[in-house]
UniProtKB/Swiss-Prot annotation:
<dbReference type="GO" id="GO:0008270">
    <property type="term" value="F:zinc ion binding"/>
</dbReference>
<dbReference type="Pfam" id="PF11940">
    <property type="entry name" value="DUF3458"/>
</dbReference>
<dbReference type="Pfam" id="PF01433">
    <property type="entry name" value="Peptidase_M1"/>
</dbReference>
<keyword id="KW-0378">Hydrolase</keyword>
<dbReference type="InterPro" id="IPR038438">
    <property type="entry name" value="PepN_Ig-like_sf"/>
</dbReference>
<keyword id="KW-0645">Protease</keyword>
<keyword id="KW-0479">Metal-binding</keyword>
<dbReference type="InterPro" id="IPR014782">
    <property type="entry name" value="Peptidase_M1_dom"/>
</dbReference>
<dbReference type="InterPro" id="IPR037144">
    <property type="entry name" value="Peptidase_M1_pepN_C_sf"/>
</dbReference>
<feature type="binding site">
    <location>
        <position position="297"/>
    </location>
    <ligand>
        <name>Zn(2+)</name>
    </ligand>
</feature>
<feature type="site" description="Transition state stabilizer">
    <location>
        <position position="381"/>
    </location>
</feature>
<keyword id="KW-0482">Metalloprotease</keyword>
<dbReference type="GO" id="GO:0016285">
    <property type="term" value="F:alanyl aminopeptidase activity"/>
</dbReference>
<dbReference type="InterPro" id="IPR042097">
    <property type="entry name" value="Aminopeptidase_N-like_N_sf"/>
</dbReference>
<keyword id="KW-0997">Cell inner membrane</keyword>
<keyword id="KW-0862">Zinc</keyword>
<feature type="binding site">
    <location>
        <position position="121"/>
    </location>
    <ligand>
        <name>substrate</name>
    </ligand>
</feature>
Length: 870
């Protein structure tokens, strides 16, 4: 590393000394050498002697002109071009060269296959030209692209196409103009040869918008679902939020080499092809729903992110937390609200809580950052969305929408802060959110402890609710938060008891604002069964001494699907904790009959939504289970999970087989009822695979060979690998032979290989680095093989001999210089060393020290390693 990366602090924010109002870009494109000409209209806002500091990385400067005159008062510093002696208003012209082909970090302008494309968020524009690369500089962009017509027949950028023409030597040009001022992180350029799916959407005010979806040649038949999802997103945003699209054209381009999931560049979204391409034989139900969600997410950014952007990157959750909330609502309105909520909560409990307990713990609005790319996190996005959801809960839909309208009235066309958003919500609703604001500044997961008491003589039921947030590496002191805590009370017949106090009805969302509070309810005629933290009304851990009877009662009677699922989770948690302790003492699994019977009742319930039944029957992942413990024993957790699966498979064998057969569907449709039945059927298959081996082998093999869709084929393959059935190797080979030329389809196969419970899994993963479908230059391949091994196979990654850690160190050493962003994602499991026993900690620490000693250690890795070793 050349020099130690410097931390940036939120409280150091200063408005820029200069603003750029308009920028005219010309790209003379070539993969090896692209010439960029940037002509900017600049205005000074700071002191008259303030120099103009432009950000730039990996650029070859050709010339600098001010008002058409060659300028000499400039100097290049590391990561910057500093220009002095400037007039108050001026035209700045910079010419520089870049090499897209040499750009393996996939930040700025780079090569994806035969195409050229960009990724500018957060700080990628500085890899294209010298500029004020910060989100509070909003300019109108005009972009002219010149390129070889045969190689790059399509030349795309933001806004509307305003001119085009032919040049000699087989070259052509296109000019684009975006009338909306935007920060440079929203700039995009794509050049290549594509198949195009075209459609139109008529907005509610009657404007016709051209929709264009660009995919690699030969992939057109995998594009229609994405187009359907886009039209659904546009319609939903008009109906639910009153927001209409504002340009004449909306383009999406799918590329194979992409660090993120997708990017909301104004009018020209660039997507990881994983979130665009789907055909029934290549994509699962989950893929279809993920595509719908991500297309929605990027489209919704047009207002929450583009029309109103962030003042600085510390405010990232302003656009991301809000837009994730919007995409969750979109998925819930179009699909099953309960299943969507359950999946959001699985992410929070299994992954985000772990981030809160890690060395990288940060509030949803961080206070200190070294490398901004490291803060595109579950905390900023998913916990950020939970914070928006709490505001929605406290205000209600009507007031929340008034708050949104006020937010746009005040901030459209400008760069705003999280405080601006909360202020708009407060002003529109007259609800005091001053205490609530602590969610933006405090990190960590609050723990809410509930104690209850019933007095049959006074017919009163009392809840005592206390909260504490454990210290995190970034904050020793914690304050009580404003927690909306939703409850329901059930009588012994399973009916909801109306909440009353002093003859008045009480809202079912309790406002918990102090370290400890007591809530008393009158006219409760029996000892009630409480449902607590209904709908996961706040992102907290709940502590309450449940009895098994209470939980099985809620699994049967709760009127809310989420509460039924959550009760099943709590019941399992009791026996996961018990059995991990037993395993550590060398004792066998113990599971009372009534627990198996509670799951049997779900299978036999004819009224239950199959989608909910499937969720209840899906055991928590090993990562979700890990969050039940302070010190994680990955081997014990994996073995308890398998033993639990085998026990339930044996106990419920007849019911599982009956439900499996009853939910067979001959046709495949992406409809929510069909998805629900498939999910339930495949959840049953997963258990059946752990039953009697011969029967399981036949059943799984039959489903794999008869499947007319990827969902069922992959479910069979996945079950074969998880249960280590005799048929697994033959099935895996068949899949490889059929799909080895399709990277996205092979990603599923790589994930199964990497998460296999086989003892020699690491040896297999090492061998697959040489597989014909694998390459270290594609982030999707890296995530599906190396990422899945390190992040989703903890028993193997945390092998006692430290072999998993050494493997990851090798991979990160390569990726550190090749693609620091991807390396930084992969290191996460290694930095959480303090959650493991002393022997593992020692080996993890040694691995981190080895990485810390790399000569050219990237800022991305430096930040995480130094925090982990602190």
């Amino acid at each position: 590393m050349t020099q130690q990366p410097q931390a940036k602090y939120r409280h150091d924010y200063r408005a820029p000394d200069y603003q750029i109002t308009d920028i005219d870009l010309t790209f003379d494109l070539d993969a090896q050498k692209t010439v960029v000409t940037a002509v900017s209209q600049a205005v000074r806002h700071g002191a008259s002697d303030a120099p103009l500091r432009l950000n730039g990385e990996d650029l070859k400067l050709v010339s600098v002109h001010i008002n058409d005159e060659p300028w000499t008062a400039w100097k290049e510093e590391e990561g910057a071009l500093v220009i002095s002696n400037l007039p108050e208003r001026f035209t700045l012209k910079i010419i520089n060269e870049i090499s897209p082909a040499a750009n393996t970090a996939l930040e700025g302008l780079y090569q994806s296959g035969d195409a050229l494309c960009t990724q500018c968020e957060a700080e990628g524009f500085r890899h294209i030209t010298y500029y004020l690369d910060r989100p509070d500089v909003l300019a109108r962009f005009t972009t002219k692209i010149i390129a070889d017509k045969i190689k790059y027949p399509f030349l795309l950028s933001n806004g509307n196409r305003v001119a085009q023409g032919e040049l000699e030597n087989g070259r052509h040009w296109v000019q684009w103009q975006d009338p909306f001022p935007k920060p440079c992180y929203l700039f995009a350029l794509v050049a290549g040869d594509f198949d195009v799916l075209r459609d139109t959407f008529t907005t509610r005010s009657g404007r016709e918008v051209a929709l264009e979806l660009y995919v690699d040649r030969g992939n057109l038949d995998r594009a229609p679902w994405a187009m359907t999802s886009l039209k659904n997103s546009m319609k939903w945003d008009e109906e639910r939020f009153g927001l209409e699209y504002d340009l004449d054209i909306y383009m999406i381009v799918a590329v194979d080499f992409f660090n993120m999931g997708a990017m909301e560049n104004k009018g020209l979204n660039i997507f990881n092809s994983k979130y665009v391409l789907a055909r029934t034989d290549t994509a699962t139900d989950k893929d279809y729903l993920d595509i719908e969600r991500v297309i929605g997410h990027e489209y919704f950014h047009n207002w929450t992110g583009n029309r109103v952007t962030c003042r600085d990157w510390f405010q990232l959750s302003l656009k991301e937390g809000l837009t994730v909330f919007r995409d969750q609502e979109f998925s819930s309105d179009l699909g099953s609200r309960a299943v969507n909520r359950i999946n959001n909560v699985r992410t929070m409990r299994g992954l985000q809580f772990a981030e809160d307990a890690s060395p990288m713990a940060h509030p949803i609005r961080p206070d200190m950052v070294i490398e901004m790319n490291n803060f595109y996190t579950l905390t900023v996005y998913e916990k950020g969305a939970e914070v928006i959801r709490m505001i929605h809960t406290l205000l209600g839909e009507e007031n929340f929408q008034k708050g949104m309208q006020l937010y746009f009235e005040r901030h459209d066309g400008s760069a705003a802060t999280c405080d601006d958003f909360v202020q708009a919500m407060e002003d529109a609703s007259n609800v005091d959110l001053s205490h609530f604001r602590r969610w933006y500044s405090q990190s960590g997961t609050p723990i809410v402890t509930v104690k209850d008491d019933y007095n049959p003589e006074t017919e009163q039921y009392t809840l005592t609710i206390s909260q504490r947030t454990p210290a995190t590496p970034d904050q020793a002191e914690k304050q009580p938060l404003h927690i909306p805590f939703a409850i329901e009370l059930y009588d012994n017949e399973g009916k909801v008891i109306p909440l009353q106090k002093g003859g008045h009805p009480v809202n079912s969302v309790l406002n918990v604002t102090q370290a400890e509070q007591t809530f008393v309810f009158d006219n409760v005629y029996f000892q009630p069964v409480p449902a607590l933290l209904c709908e996961f009304s706040a992102p907290v851990k709940l502590e309450y001494k449940w009895s098994d009877q209470q939980l099985t009662f809620l699994m049967r009677h709760a009127r809310n699907d989420f509460s039924r699922w959550d009760a099943a989770q709590s019941l399992l948690a009791t026996y996961i904790k018990l059995n991990v302790a037993r395993h550590q003492q060398g004792q066998p699994l113990s599971l009372p009959v009534h627990v198996a019977d509670a799951f049997r009742a779900v299978l036999l319930d004819e009224k239950i939504d199959p989608a909910l039944a499937a969720e209840i029957l899906t055991l928590p992942s090993v990562n979700e289970m890990a969050e039940l413990f302070d010190i994680i024993d990955p081997i014990a957790i994996a073995e308890v999970r398998e033993a639990l699966t085998r026990t339930l498979a044996t106990e419920l064998a007849d019911e599982l087989l009956a439900i499996y057969n009853a939910n067979y569907q001959s046709e495949y449709r992406v409809e929510h009822e069909d998805i629900a039945k498939r999910t339930l059927r495949n959840a049953c298959l997963r258990f059946l695979a752990f039953g009697e081996t011969h029967l399981a082998d036949v059943l799984v093999s039959k489903q794999f060979h008869e499947a007319n869709n990827m969902t069922d084929a992959l479910a069979a393959l996945s079950a074969a690998v998880a249960a280590q059935l005799p048929c697994r190797d033959a099935l895996m080979q068949e899949y490889d032979d059929k799909w080895h030329q399709n990277g996205l389809v092979m990603d599923k196969w790589f994930i199964l290989q990497a998460t296999s419970p086989a003892a020699n899994v690491l040896e297999t993963v090492r061998g697959l680095l040489q597989h014909r479908s694998f390459t270290m230059s594609n982030p999707n391949r890296i995530r599906s093989l190396i990422g899945a091994f390190a992040g989703s196979n903890p028993a193997a990654f945390h092998a006692e001999d430290g072999s998993g850690y050494l493997f990851l160190v090798e991979m990160l050493t390569d990726l550190n210089s090749r693609n620091p962003q991807v390396a930084s994602r992969l290191i996460e499991p290694l930095i959480r060393l303090k959650r493991y026993d002393a022997k593992r900690q020692e080996k993890m620490r040694a691995a981190l020290e080895q990485l810390k000693g790399l000569e050219n250690l990237s800022g991305d890795l430096y930040e995480k390693i130094t925090k982990a070793l602190a």
